[in-house]
Amino acid sequence: SKISQSVNTIYKNENKIIGDNTDIFGFETSLKKSNQIIKNKKALILGAGGVVPSIIIALQKMQVLKIFLTNRTPEKALEIKKMFSEVETLSWGDIVDFDIIINATSIGLKPAESIDLDYKKISKNKFFYDVIYNPSETGFLKKARQFGAHTENGKMMFIYQALGAFKIWNGFQPKIDDELIKLL
């Protein structure tokens, strides 16, 4: 949580309150379970909110080749750049060649909202990830899927970060299977 400067789980240890971050584990595990190869790939992150440092750390752990970041408010992207100097910032709307694109903005929480991309230029071997899990298919994911891209929403990230928090609090991680996931 020090590197990400983000805490989403707190617990008590020897009368001290400790802050931890399970978003890194959640994002990394969800990518691994999606069977997408991330190593030596180029990632483009849309947004610069609180979860983005965790996403960057997870991508680095998975040995992505290059990380690009764009945000509607350029100052917020530059704050992330101060934390991760190797990240290349872009102006909002600029798109570079990428293998994985991650929507970490709030665009898509409302059904009528969509990210303005030229989806026709995006080949079928691209991977679109949206941290939003409700709705389960945002306009971003729907359009990408219509053009043949692989897509994943943030549901599994949410589940895995919750499992990480549960393990911190209880000392063990419960097993989950497809049946349980369908219920969530």
What do the PLM-derived regions correspond to, one by one?
Residues 85-152:
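Rossmann-like adenosine-cofactor binding region
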Residues 62-84:
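NAD(P)-binding Rossmann-fold cofactor-contacting core
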Residues 61-66, 146-150:
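Conserved S-adenosyl-L-methionine
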Residues 12, 127-180:
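Rossmann-fold NAD(P)-binding glycine/threonine-rich loop
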